[in-house]
Amino acid sequence: CFLWHVRKRVADQELGDAPFLDRLRRDQKSLRGRGSTLGLDIKTATRAGKQIVERILKEESDEALKMTMASVPASRYLTDMTLEEMSRDW
């Protein structure tokens, strides 16, 4: 949930490319599925993740550091991509 909110912030600032945005949408569906499978309240979990991201962004004044923190999961989404996604003409 935390990483999803970090990615969402990047997308909201229009810094994500097409594969990044596609991954964000799939992650959102995946979170819903995992929540129901595990019997978790996904709204509570995503709210907690959002609060963590907002606190980091509020407390950190260095813009470059904010972007570094926000881009950390970006390398992970590439490794999680399927062959179909990698071969897609974006």
Curated annotation (Swiss-Prot):
Primary residence: host cell
GO CC aspect terms: host cell cytoplasm; host cell nucleus
Key words of the record: Eukaryotic host gene expression shutoff by virus, Host cytoplasm, Host gene expression shutoff by virus, Host mRNA suppression by virus, Host nucleus, Host-virus interaction, Inhibition of host innate immune response by virus, Inhibition of host pre-mRNA processing by virus, Interferon antiviral system evasion, Isopeptide bond, RNA-binding, Ubl conjugation, Viral immunoevasion
Cross-linked residues, Glycyl lysine isopeptide (Lys-Gly) (interchain with G-Cter in ISG15): 8, 29
Post-translational modification, as annotated: Upon interferon induction, ISGylated via host HERC5; this results in the impairment of NS1 interaction with RNA targets due to its inability to form homodimers and to interact with host EIF2AK2/PKR. There are two ISGylated forms.
Keyword Ligase applies: no
Gene3D superfamilies in UniProt: Influenza virus non-structural protein, effector domain, S15/NS1, RNA-binding
Protein name: Non-structural protein 1
Species this chain originates from: Influenza A virus (strain A/Camel/Mongolia/1982 H1N1)
Gene giving rise to this polypeptide: NS
